[in-house]
């Protein structure tokens, strides 16, 4: 067999164990223990995709043995998740049955859990807007049966140890709360917390679950547990992926974009659309940059209209921006918007008299994909965007402009390199398409002293990055919103002439501390007023 092949053997078939012992990389599944070898021991199985813990009157026990590189793998002591879901959950011990049926106080007294914060950690605190505790599946099952909320799982990988779900309160259908949890047997969880050192204020604890160390955060007060929860795994909660510097300095030839997950869809919680997630993740990324956010920030949003005659992107931007920010949006189609000013019509005829601090563009021309021949730079609305950046974007301002494999512009790639920082950002919810946002932070214009790479080469570098990088498809970050709001960083607005731009001023531009534009009233949108504060 190929050395990279892992062979699975069933010990109930004669001769399987002997073949397992001579195979380089293999797994042996047995319902009997093999003397002298350490195993992963599971006390449940799956029958027609449903978890079962007994067959007839006999308990189900599986022993799993592993060989790697011709050697037996010694298994560490571990707790194991139970493979249940919210819909298929059934208690597997007397303690779990008591948890679902007994009063909270009586249960805690019966099992001696007074010092372990069970009221918060396991029973769950739903008295506040943000859900507290409930980090075991059985916690959600108990409260959902009481009619307090509904639960919707949203992790794609069903075999994940740490899962997440979206919880909606029954008395507030518009609410969305995220809850991370594991399906550990309650008896095992009690063993875990009773083994903790409570003489600390805070501590990161490694808990071995499914043969892997998971970090849990422990907080105590007066030798009592206040909270104990699994830390989020950053990769699954990443709002997206930014193009690394290494790919920006390549000199690739343009190839077709060939994504491994092209066209795949991610299941979204009820009431949340892809555009809402996309814009939320874009805003979350912009929060990590040196974006200038002055008082009365000016923002222009192009391509605002969605398929339903509304502007979901503007709604997200309005929620993200400081309350005193001025949001202007535009689209070719009629639409309803949360922007302060909306202009309907072709963006190329949109006359801008004043300078803006942030440009967000979701413009896309579907006809670019059907053009025969080579995939070359497109003009169209990109000509307007390039002119806007050169003439109407504040020095120190920023942009986020959508591109795709076929919808791109050579001059825009070269212009974006005149920002202090630039990248291409792909939102996690849209990694199954070639779409990305060209991000430019802190515009320097003619004061940029960096070498400019040809735009055709840079687009080829982008496609090469997309083809060579596996990106997880996820919307998880949209539910992690405590720090979503964009906060004013008191960036200064000054109106300076070219001869007044010395090294100190340019240094402030680079650091996102300064914007250069007029600071008077925003003009020429009076005929398109939509919302009154």
Curated annotation (Swiss-Prot):
MF annotations from Gene Ontology: endonuclease activity; mRNA (nucleoside-2'-O-)-methyltransferase activity; RNA nuclease activity
Q: List each copy of the NendoU domain by range.
A: 90-230
Keyword Nuclease in annotation: yes
| Gene that encodes the chain | rep
Q: What Gene3D superfamilies is this protein classified in? A: 3.40.50.11580, Vaccinia Virus protein VP39
The active site lies at: 120, 135, 176, 278, 362, 402, 435
EC number(s) given by UniProt: 3.1.-.-, 2.1.1.-
Q: Name one GO biological process term.
A: viral translational frameshifting
List the source organism. Answer: Porcine transmissible gastroenteritis coronavirus (strain FS772/70)
Entries under SUPFAM superfamilies matching the protein: EndoU-like, S-adenosyl-L-methionine-dependent methyltransferases
User: In this protein, which residues make up the domain named AV-Nsp11N/CoV-Nsp15M?
Assistant: 1-73
Annotated function? The replicase polyprotein of coronaviruses is a multifunctional protein: it contains the activities necessary for the transcription of negative stranded RNA, leader RNA, subgenomic mRNAs and progeny virion RNA as well as proteinases responsible for the cleavage of the polyprotein into functional products. Nsp9 is a ssRNA-binding protein.
Q: Pfam families annotated for this entry?
A: CoV_Methyltr_2 (PF06460), CoV_NSP15_C (PF19215), CoV_NSP15_M (PF19216)
Q: Does the keyword Transcription regulation apply?
A: no
The site (Cleavage) lies at: 233-234
Name assigned to this protein? Replicase polyprotein 1ab
Q: Which residues form the Nidovirus-type SAM-dependent 2'-O-MTase domain?
A: 234-530
Cite the entry's keywords alphabetically: Endonuclease, Hydrolase, Methyltransferase, Nuclease, Transferase
